[in-house]
Structure formats: structure tokens, C-alpha cells
């Protein structure tokens, strides 16, 4: 089956700063500096520019390899295209955790749960944007039990949503409650929901698009799920969806991001190996598409992490009255969307335009090879 190959792959083209990426193409980014070592279970988040900065940064938090779990934070500056170490202070080592940036403090990164070699966690930690140190704030309400819960896309506004997760080995927690953490009030709650929630699972993707949370796949014991569920936080009603199109196979340890009305899903594992396919789901039409690429595909992988980043390119305006479209990343409501502005330029004036890329870092195959590569492809 196409997409199940995980061995030696052809080298992908390199996307250089300022280059305009082509659609239906996977690229690698090769940035110098203090890059993260190969790892799995890390989180990957895009931070918008702070203060006078023109470009944002990608933050890679935690993760693990077969020998240890990490408490480091690495950043990729999208202006200088260099890696750096942000901090090693205060973060408890963890992997397969959740991360989010609340709208009340969009330059603070929160992490929840995950595990290290000694067991699962259920604590929350936050990194201050001023001094880049981590703290463990006191919270109220009943937190979820300790669990792995690997996502960077399950937040809407100030609230992180937690469903399911890993207990031990291939077994999920039996809890099917929806847990909500509010970063503004520092409170956990378990709102009453309606309908039938998904069965217990871990390794599923949970991604917010607008006011809806979508859950796909996951694992319980040796059973891989291929179902798709949705809950709208407006009425708190669970729905099991029956989408059309190229429905993905049952898988776990994959990753997903939302861009407008689309959810992009990449990678994961099945009983036969690691996947390197990308799917697009239209949340309004409830339709799946498997994306076709003009170039080689990345190596199949699982337990990687993804986020959506803006990528500036330079275009030359031949007409002073011509308009260039500028896309900006909007994640105020927990999803990435596109906002168009127009900008007029003089004859032959270079003006910046921005495209949105899905950024993928790390992961591993089912043969034990752990990756430290950076992959990108255009999403729209």
C-alpha cells in the first residue's frame, strides 16, 4: 500500500529562506544552530512575534529518546532561520504531553500531563515569556488522572480540552470525561456532555477547528481505531461522524493541525508499520481527501509533532496598482485561519507575501530509528 514505506526515502528538496514553496511538495528545512536532538513525544508550537520582532518562533518542548526524557526547550527563529536553546530551567522532563498558548497570554506556553521514565504526570507548567523560566502554578478543581496526551492543537481561546490518553503500555485510561482547563482562572472542570463519547483510547489526534473539537483514531490494547468524533463546545454534544471520501485507515500516534475549515493529518502507525501519508478533512463537508504529492514522501513516522507557521516570500510587483495578498496566522480561537489584506506597491517593487506551511519535527519509525528532521509543506 502506498504510504506504508518507512525505509530509506529519496532526499527531499531544501526550502531556503525567502523561497516560494510549491504546493504538493514536501521540503526539508536545514537551519544552523543548537537544534534539538532526535526525539519523540515532544510538543511543537508557533509563537507569534513579540514586541518589535518581525518574525515569530517555533518552540520544541520536551520529548524523549529510548534512553531518557527531556526537559529542554529549543526555538527556531523564523526571521534568522536559526536554532537556539530557550531554557533548561524548571521544566519537569516529559514526553507525550499536551501544549497550548492561551489567548489571554499568547506568549506563554502551557504544558499538561505526559510522562517520564518514572511514570505519568498530570501537572500543569507554564513558561513565562519574560524570563523564559517554567513554573508550576496552583490550580483549582479536579485535574485529570495522570496520563499521556500528545497534542498541540486541542485548545480554544483560553481553554485546553483533554479527552482520553495513555495509562500504561498500550492501555488507555478508562476515563471518558471531557476535562477542561481554563488558563485565565487556573481552574479544571468537567462539563456535562451529551451523546456518546468515543471509547477509551490513547494516541488519538484531538484538534480544534472553530468551536468544534475533532478526535480521530487512537489505540486500545491491540485495536486501532479509524473512527472520527466531534464535540461542539457550544452545546457540548458528542457526535460520531460518517465522513465520505478517502477515509484514513485506523492508526495511532499521528498528528493533526487545523487551517480554517480543514484538518490536516500526517503520519502515525498501524499494525503493519509507520505511515507517511497526509490527509485533509473538510469540517463542513465532512469529506476526507488523501493528498497527492509531486515529489518524494517523507519517511513514515509516529509520535512526531506539527504546527502551522507563516512563511514569508518575496514577490516582485510589475504594476504599481497591483495588489499582493498577505496571509496572517490567526489562532485566537484555537485554529489557524487565513486573513487577507492588500498592499499596493510601485513598479518592480519587492513586496512580502506569506504562505502557510505545516511544520513537522522528529518522530520515529517502527524499527526504532528516531528522527531530528524538519519537514514542511504548503497548507491552504
From Swiss-Prot:
Its main location: cytoplasm. One of its GO terms (cellular component) is endosome membrane. This is Rab9 effector protein with kelch motifs. Interacts with PIKFYVE; the interaction recruits RABEPK to the endosomal membrane. Interacts with RAB9 in its GTP-bound conformation. It comes from the Eukaryota. Phosphorylated on Ser residues by PIKFYVE. SUPFAM superfamilies: Kelch motif. Kelch repeats lie at residues 57-103, 108-154, 159-211, 212-258, 262-311, 357-380. Rab9 effector required for endosome to trans-Golgi network (TGN) transport. It is found in: Cytoplasm; Endosome membrane. Signal peptide: none annotated. The keyword Phosphoprotein applies.
Amino acid at each position: 500500500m502506498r504510504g506504508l514505506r518507512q525505509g530509506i526515502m529519496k532526499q527531499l528538496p531544501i526550502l531556503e529562506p525567502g523561497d516560494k514553496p510549491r504546493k504538493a511538495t514536501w521540503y526539508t528545512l536545514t537551519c544552523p544552530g543548537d537544534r534539538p536532538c532526535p526525539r519523540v513525544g515532544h510538543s511543537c508550537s508557533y509563537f507569534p512575534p513579540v514586541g518589535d520582532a518581525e518574525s515569530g518562533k517555533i518552540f520544541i518542548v520536551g520529548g524523549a529518546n529510548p534512553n531518557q526524557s527531556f526537559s529542554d526547550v529549543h526555538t527556531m527563529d523564523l526571521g534568522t532561520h536559526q536554532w537556539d536553546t530557550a531554557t533548561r530551567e524548571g521544566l519537569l522532563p516529559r514526553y507525550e504531553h499536551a501544549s497550548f498558548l492561551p489567548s489571554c497570554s499568547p506568549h506563554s506556553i502551557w504544558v499538561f500531563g505526559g510522562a517520564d521514565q518514572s511514570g505519568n504526570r498530570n501537572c500543569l507548567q507554564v513558561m513565562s515569556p519574560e524570563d523564559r523560566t517554567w513554573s508550576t502554578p496552583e490550580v483549582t478543581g479536579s485535574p485529570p488522572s495522570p496520563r499521556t496526551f500528545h497534542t498541540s492543537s486541542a485548545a480554544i481561546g483560553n481553554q485546553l480540552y483533554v479527552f482520553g490518553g495513555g495509562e500504561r503500555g498500550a492501555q488507555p485510561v478508562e476515563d471518558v470525561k471531557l476535562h477542561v482547563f481554563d488558563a485565565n482562572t487556573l481552574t479544571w472542570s468537567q462539563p456535562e456532555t451529551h451523546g456518546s463519547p468515543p471509547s477509551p483510547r490513547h494516541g488519538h489526534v484531538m484538534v480544534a477547528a472553530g468551536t468544534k473539537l475533532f478526535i480521530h483514531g487512537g489505540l486500545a490494547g491491540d485495536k486501532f481505531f479509524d473512527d472520527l468524533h466531534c464535540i461542539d463546545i457550544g452545546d457540548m454534544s458528542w457526535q460520531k461522524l460518517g465522513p465520505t471520501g478517502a477515509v484514513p485507515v485506523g492508526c495511532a500516534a499521528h498528528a493533526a493541525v487545523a487551517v480554517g475549515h480543514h484538518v490536516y493529518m500526517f503520519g502515525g502507525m498501524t499494525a503493519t508499520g509507520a505511515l507517511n501519508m497526509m490527509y485533509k478533512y473538510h469540517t463542513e463537508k465532512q469529506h476526507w481527501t488523501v493528498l497527492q504529492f509531486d515529489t518524494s514522501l517523507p519517511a513514515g513516522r509516529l509520535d512526531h509533532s506539527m504546527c502551522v507557521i507563516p512563511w514569508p516570500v518575496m514577490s516582485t510587483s510589475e504594476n504599481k496598482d497591483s495588489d499582493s495578498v498577505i496571509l496572517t496566522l490567526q489562532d485566537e480561537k484555537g485554529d489557524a485561519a487565513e486573513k487577507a489584506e492588500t498592499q499596493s506597491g510601485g513598479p518592480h517593487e519587492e513586496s512580502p507575501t506569506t504562505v502557510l506551511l505545516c511544520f513537522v519535527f522528529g518522530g520515529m519509525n517502527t524499527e526504532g530509528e528516531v528522527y531530528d528532521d524538519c519537514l514542511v509543506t504548503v497548507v491552504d
